[in-house]
Swiss-Prot record:
Residues 379-620 are annotated as: RecA-like domain 2. One of its GO terms (molecular function) is catalytic activity, acting on a nucleic acid. Signal peptide: none annotated. This is ATP-dependent DNA/RNA helicase DHX36. Coiled coil: none annotated. Keywords: Acetylation, Activator, Antiviral defense, ATP-binding, Cell projection, Chromosome, Cytoplasm, Developmental protein, Differentiation, DNA-binding, Helicase, Hydrolase, Immunity, Innate immunity, Magnesium, Metal-binding, Mitochondrion, Nucleotide-binding, Nucleus, Phosphoprotein, Repeat, Repressor, RNA-binding, Telomere, Transcription, Transcription regulation, Translation regulation, Transport. One of its GO terms (biological process) is positive regulation of telomere maintenance. Found in a multi-helicase-TICAM1 complex at least composed of DHX36, DDX1, DDX21 and TICAM1; this complex exists in resting cells with or without dsRNA poly(I:C) ligand stimulation. Interacts (via C-terminus) with TICAM1 (via TIR domain). Interacts (via C-terminus) with DDX21; this interaction serves as bridges to TICAM1. Interacts with TERT; this interaction is dependent on the ability of DHX36 to bind to the G-quadruplex RNA (G4-RNA) structure present in the telomerase RNA template component (TERC). Residues 257-309, 490-549, 630-689, 841-852, 862-892 are annotated as: Necessary for interaction with single-stranded DNA at the 3'-end of the G4-DNA structure. Residues 1-53 are annotated as: Disordered. A motif (Nuclear localization signal) lies at residues 509-520. ATPase activity is enhanced in the presence of homomeric poly(U) RNAs, but not by double-stranded DNA (dsDNA), double-stranded RNA (dsRNA) and tRNA. It is an enzyme of class 3 (hydrolase). The gene is Dhx36.
Length: 1000
């Protein structure tokens, strides 16, 4: 039943008075606290209450007081008379759409002279669009074709190598053989051969090739430095060329990280006396960047995600002869999924050769997963490394902590943080049980002083004072060689750096101290690979990035802090957690291996022998500790079957709870229907290479014509923001970031402002770009990556029909890009329901804000946010990208949003009455005051928006903003006009002293 929007409008065209109802400014329930009886005057508790009852009485009274304060703080949703009348006419006109002959000729202008009118679409047109959509859905489910692709170039760019044919070519076979023979006389090739022959893998060349040729799947295990990544692919290619069938060989080797794919490809090309790519034998392909090799007789190194993307275009990888999955022991989510896909693919591609390459410790597990396929081990190439445990270090350097307020061993238990998995709790119990016997055993071999220090050590923290003392000892007592320190995160790296620099000795030019972290400027990090001059000692302080991603050749001393930052996903509370946890045995082994690459080395582990015996063999696979929404969409777009069924066949299947929660979230997002099939929106989100909420934001940025800034935000959220934090300049960097915020109260718009400033500086020349990045602590490499990603997103939108140009800056797609409020509305559309409420706390000393979420209660804005110290908010709602529990629950990347943003782009709307207040609520908890007639207008407009958006998603085409008679233009213009003109929302009935605070 439709609502009559005329019923609330008086005959003279103005709004009817809503009446004061239960009148006048509050008063009301004076005695609501229950007062009465003797002592109950002036808010005191009743005299008959005793002990705990008194506390409960006051708690109940405070709860009632808080609820009433919250009621009074509700913002008022209102609109002026002119807009109200216009929207009444618009909605009544749209309701008449079933009358085929009615075509409203209404046209009017908002106060900003922004006219919007309506033209009723015919039923015939709607039916034809639905019919077209049904045909397309049928295509999606039955054929391997792209959904509504009008321009295939955006798919083909990263798939160029895959889409090339691989047919036998006798002429090419002969040419490849001649080229290889010619290489053997090339001085560069000969020099490289000398190096290659020293690698352990080189002596096993014949054995490796025979095993691969005679089996469909082979597992190769080998220690760091054995040469498996660079040599195995070359052995295969050269064998094919020498057998005269080189054109049939197309090897693709996956790498878990971009930096690895590039560096390995360049190394292999150099070993073959060639340049990387350019039609030679070796190249690489990573997202938005490639140097492709020749079409046939070639090796391509690529990131795992590239293969998953290829599978959308060719589910059988028809043109690939060999697929090498490298570093699979790392167990990242994409490699685990790809293994299962490849396992299924083997049934259809009996000619496909699969080579799995892993570190030594768990090769058997991969062999078992692939039907007990053959394994071969390549020995490592490292010098002996002496290992020291915590008790050895304390004894060796005679360490005694200056501060004695260390906590007990068992105050927080085996694991730091909030990860309470059963196996961890069991290990904690074992640790506590064995500790007395372990200490007793140590007393026979170590001094009493060492035992005392061990007893007082705080297991929760990495002892940075101990590390500083150990570095000093190595520098003064041991021989030359670089020192590599492994720490969990940025805060530890920063503190240790400060500790060292506070000592006069380390300030001299005899030391080069290099922090290595993703937040650090990359220009500083290039020094890490350079050999230092004689007399200068390099000290590298790094996270686990230095375990496998990069190799620092001159390291002799490794200090293993014993902890690693690990993200988990708590399915019960629907929250990500990050904590510093103990390393696994595999981590410890990798760290030890960093010390013996060029000469005998030393590795110092900052945990005791009992702890070492209880370490996990490996880190928990990523798929068991991460949200699965993006993966679920990939499973559906690749047509891999039912989500739960496919995930159950992984090497380590995620929990049923995690799968159910992800499917539920995707249904709430309207990406999956009740049968777990992709909706039209789901198809678009699955094709975008970002997580679903960011994908939805991208689509809305196109629909609401604020494309360029929204793509900047989406790229930053899915990659990383461009800010860097040089050590010692943290406060200046924070100040510069707040300067870029420009009073937007938005981390997202801060990135937009930073990016636009960079674009302007870049247009003026390299020197201006460099100065701009230096002044505002920005990474030009990251900004360039964001620029490239924006181009990729725009091509996806063009291919799907949402925009008419591949340029993010196309004027037609950016009509509203200068309007901050509309951009915030689109951010809200993408990130909802990630909403938090702000409450202004007017304390005696200074104003403060408290932030709450529906499920967690009190939370904190992350210290790096531009909103962390903000008190003058215009509204009291934030939308955020990420909620993570570390030492407390933090909100990352948040933006203040207005009531209309939440009403039009949030959840379900309901209209209710709360005592004397008429209210409109979003999902029952985001509540605003609103006269009933206004609430019905908003709800009616929201309903029309939902219908329009559904049509746009099912049959994408750009909005024609010049067609002021169309329904699309009329509805969108009315909504955008309300959002743009939303005033600061101050509740009508707040006490006068609070009127300087803004609410909504």
């Amino acid at each position: 039943m439709s609502y009559d929007y005329h019923q609330s409008w008086s005959r003279d065209g103005g709004p009817r008075g809503s009446g004061q109802g239960s009148g006048g400014g509050g008063g009301g329930s004076r005695g609501s606290g229950g007062g009465g009886g003797g002592r109950g005057g002036r808010g005191r508790h009743p005299a008959h209450l005793k002990g705990r009852e008194i506390g409960l009485w006051y708690a109940k009274k405070q709860t009632q007081k808080n609820k009433e304060a919250e009621r009074q703080e509700r913002a008022v949703v209102h609109m002026d008379e002119r807009r109200e009348e216009q929207i009444v006419q618009l909605l009544n006109s749209v309701q008449a759409k079933n009358d085929k002959d009615s075509e409203a000729q209404i046209s009017w202008f908002a106060p900003e002279d922004h006219g919007y009118g309506t033209e009723v679409s015919s039923e015939k047109k709607i039916n034809s669009e639905k019919k077209l959509d049904n045909q397309e859905k049928k295509l999606l489910n039955q054929e391997k074709k792209t959904y509504r692709i009008t321009d295939k170039s955006y798919i083909d760019r990263d798939s160029e190598y895959l889409l090339q044919q691989n047919e036998p070519n006798l002429g090419l076979d002969q040419q490849l053989l001649e080229d290889l023979q010619k290489k053997k006389t090339d001085p560069r090739y000969i020099e490289m051969q000398r190096f290659r022959k020293k690698l352990p893998s080189y002596g096993m060349q014949k054995e490796l090739v025979n095993l691969i040729n005679n089996h469909q799947v082979t597992v190769i295990s080998g220690e760091t430095g054995c040469g498996k990544t660079t040599q195995v692919t070359q052995f295969i290619l050269d064998n094919y060329i020498e057998r005269g069938i080189g054109s049939a060989c197309r090897i693709v080797c996956t790498q878990p990280r971009r930096i690895s794919a590039i560096s390995v490809a360049e190394r292999v090309a150099a070993e073959r006396a060639e340049s990387c790519g350019n039609g030679n034998s070796t190249g690489y392909q990573i997202r938005l960047q490639s140097r492709l090799p020749r079409k046939q007789g070639s090796i391509l190194y690529c990131t795992t995600g590239i293969i998953l993307q290829w599978l959308q275009s060719d589910s059988r990888l028809s043109s690939v002869s060999h697929i090498v999955l490298d570093e699979i022991h790392e167990r990242n989510l994409q490699s685990d999924v790809l293994m299962t896909v490849i396992k299924d693919l083997l049934h259809f591609r009996s000619d496909l050769k699969v080579i799995l390459m892993s570190a030594t410790l768990n090769a058997e597990k991969f062999s078992e997963y692939f039907g007990n396929c053959p394994m071969i081990h390549i020995p490592g190439f490292t010098f002996p490394v002496v290992e020291y445990l915590l008790e050895d270090i304390i004894e060796k350097i005679r360490y005694f902590p200056e501060q004695k307020e260390h906590r007990s061993q068992f105050k927080r238990g085996f694991m730091q943080g909030h990860v309470n998995r059963q196996e961890k709790e069991e290990k904690e119990a074992i640790y506590k049980e064995r500790w007395p016997a372990y200490i007793k055993e140590l007393q026979t071999r170590y001094s009493a002083s060492t035992i005392d220090v061990l007893e007082m050590m705080d297991d929760d923290k990495v002892d940075l004072n101990l590390i500083a003392a150990l570095i000093r000892y190595i520098v003064l007592e041991e021989e030359d060689g670089a020192i590599l320190v492994f720490l969990p995160g940025w805060d530890n790296i920063s503190t240790l750096h400060d500790l060292l620099m506070s000592q006069v000795m380390f300030k001299s030019d005899r030391f080069l101290i290099i922090p290595l972290h993703s937040l650090m400027p990359t220009v500083n990090q290039t020094q890490v690979f350079k050999k230092t001059p004689p007399g200068v000692r390099k000290i590298v302080i790094a996270t686990n990035i230095a375990e496998t991603s990069i190799t620092i050749d001159d390291v002799v001393y490794v200090i293993d802090g014993g902890k690693i930052k690990e993200t988990h996903f708590d399915t019960q509370n629907n929250i990500s957690t990050m904590s510093a946890e103990w390393v696994s045995k595999a981590n410890a082994k990798q760290r030890k291996g960093r010390a013996g690459r060029v000469q005998p080395g030393h590795c110092y582990h900052l945990y005791n022998g009992l702890r070492a015996s209880l370490l996990d063999d490996y880190q928990l696979p990523e798929i068991l500790r991460t949200p699965l929404e993006e993966l679920c969409l990939q499973i559906k777009i690749l047509r891999l079957g039912g989500i739960a069924y496919f995930l159950s066949r992984l090497m380590d299947p995620p929990s049923d709870e995690a799968v159910v929660l992800s499917i539920k979230h995707l249904m709430e997002l309207s990406a999956l229907d009740k049968q777990e099939e992709l909706t039209p929106l789901g198809v678009h989100l699955a094709r975008l290479p970002v997580e679903p909420h960011i994908g939805k934001m991208i689509l809305f940025g196109a629909l609401f014509c604020c494309l360029d800034p929204v793509l900047t935000i989406a790229a930053s959220l899915s990659f990383k923001d461009p800010f860097v934090i040089p050590l010692g300049k943290e406060k200046i960097a924070d100040a510069r970031r707040k300067e870029l915020a420009k009073e937007t109260r938005s981390d997202h718009l801060t990135v937009v402002n930073a990016f636009e400033g960079w674009e302007e500086a870049k247009r003026r020349g390299f020197r201006y770009e460099k100065d701009y990045c230096w002044e505002y602590f920005l990474s030009s490499n990251t900004l360039q990556m964001l620029h490239n990603m924006k181009g990729q997103f725009a091509e996806h939108l063009l291919g799907a029909g949402f925009v008419s140009s591949r340029s993010p800056k196309d004027p037609k797609a950016n009509i509203n890009s200068d309007n901050e409020k509309i951009i915030k509305a689109v951010i809200c559309a993408g990130l909802y329901p990630k909403v938090a409420k702000i409450r202004l706390n007017l304390g005696k000393k200074r104003k403060m804000v408290k932030v709450h979420t529906k499920s967690d209660g009190l939370v904190s804005i992350h210290p790096k946010s531009v909103n962390v110290e903000q008190t003058d908010f215009h509204y009291n709602w934030l939308i955020y990208h990420l909620k993570m529990r570390t030492s407390s629950i933090y909100l990352y990347d948040c933006t203040e949003v207005s009531p209309y943003c939440l009403l039009f782009f949030g959840g379900d709307i309901s209209i209710q009455k709360d005592k004397d207040q008429e209210i409109i609520a979003v999902d029952e908890w985001i509540v605003f005051q609103s006269p009933e007639r206004i609430a019905h207008l908003v709800k009616g407009l929201r309903k029309e928006l939902d219908i329009l958006l559904q049509e746009k998603i099912e049959c994408p085409h750009p909005v024609d903003w010049n067609d002021t008679k169309s329904r699309d233009c009329a509805v969108l213009s009315a909504i955008l006009d309300l959002i743009k003109t939303q005033e600061k929302a101050i509740p009508r009935n707040l006490p006068p002293r609070s009127q300087d605070g803004y609410y909504s």
